[in-house]
Every structure is written in structure tokens, then in C-alpha cells.
């Protein structure tokens, strides 16, 4: 992040954490250093971060409709797909980190701030409308995406926000950062 010169490092770091939170919501298991984009306009000599780049590993792309139906019919399978996998491609100590555990741990203040920024902007009604209006989706796919995104929002992001708000109440004068720094 510090090595590139096109985008101010603090802006890039904030964007990284915003995307991390969105990836947690959309179950992206493959966000790594090779799939970020910077839009460069050589004529104007400008550069900006691509708002969306390489999200092909979101929303269980290899899950067939029969598997989706099986997941929706088994609460323990829904919970496994929320709490056990997918994991982030980001590694800590040689292991991929768990989105729910990392977010709820509050161990990175940049992540905490992104959680606040992004959670405030998530409009589930608009997301569900988008899913309903997406052409080509089968009813089971619509149900699966709607249920899984809502469950991840409630059990990952909303739970993380509850933890963060409690921590901020206990320590109103400063960050609640508890440890790990990825940058």
C-alpha cells in the first residue's frame, strides 16, 4: 500500500477496509492483492480506486440450485456458511481469517471504522429489490441470496456493530483496537 504512488496510502487503506466489510457481507473468499483495480486516465494524469473489481468469488458462485435448496432447508448449513466459511483470503499467522471472528474481535481500528461506515449505508430493502429484479435468476437463487445476505448482515456485521458500540460506550475517548494490525 505504501509502495504505490498513485493513490494516497490512507485513502487506499480506508478503501481496503470498506471492501473487506462488503466482502464479509457478500461471502467473498478470494480478495487478495492481485484483484484490486486503479483506474488511470493518462490524458488527465489522474488515478482513482476502482469502486468494484473482481467479485467473482462472492455469493457461493459454484453452488448449484439443488445445493442452495439443501442449505436453505438446513439451519445448521446456513450457520456453517456464515460462521465457518467462507474465510477471507487475508492470512494471519499462516491461516485465513474468519470474517465473523475478526470483525467481532474489534482488533483493528481501521476495520472498526469501516464497519461503522459501511453498516450505516447498507439498505437491505434495496438489496432485496435488486435480487428480485435481477433477470435470469431462478426463484431458489433469489431466495438463497436474499436469505444468506440478510443472515450475514445480521450475524456478522450487526453483531460486530453491537460489539463495537458496547466497546465505544466503555471507552468513549479512544479507539477500541485490541491487537492485530494487517498494515
Describe the residue ranges of each PLM region:
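Conserved kinase catalytic-core segment
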Residues: 1-64
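C-terminal catalytic region of ATP-dependent kinase domains
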Residues: 41-183
Amino acid at each position: 500500500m505504501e509502495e504505490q504512488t498513485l493513490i494516497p496510502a490512507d485513502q487506499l487503506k480506508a478503501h481496503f477496509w470498506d471492501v473487506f466489510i462488503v466482502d464479509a457481507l457478500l461471502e467473498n473468499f478470494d480478495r487478495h492483492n492481485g484483484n484490486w483495480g486503479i483506474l488511470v486516465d493518462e490524458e488527465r494524469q489522474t488515478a482513482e480506486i476502482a469502486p468494484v473489481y473482481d467479485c467473482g468469488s462472492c455469493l457461493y458462485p459454484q453452488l448449484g440450485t439443488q445445493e442452495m435448496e439443501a442449505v436453505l432447508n438446513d439451519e445448521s448449513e446456513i450457520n456453517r456458511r456464515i460462521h465457518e466459511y467462507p474465510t477471507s483470503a487475508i492470512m494471519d499467522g499462516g491461516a485465513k481469517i474468519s470474517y465473523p471472528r475478526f470483525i467481532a474481535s474489534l482488533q483493528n481500528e481501521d476495520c472498526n471504522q469501516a464497519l461503522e461506515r459501511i453498516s450505516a449505508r447498507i439498505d437491505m430493502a434495496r438489496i432485496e429489490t435488486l435480487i428480485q429484479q435481477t433477470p435470469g435468476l431462478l426463484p431458489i437463487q433469489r431466495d438463497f441470496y436474499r436469505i444468506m445476505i440478510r443472515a450475514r448482515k445480521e450475524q456478522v456485521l450487526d453483531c460486530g456493530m453491537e460489539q463495537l458500540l458496547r466497546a465505544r460506550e466503555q471507552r468513549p475517548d479512544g479507539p477500541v483496537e485490541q491487537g492485530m494490525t494487517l498494515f
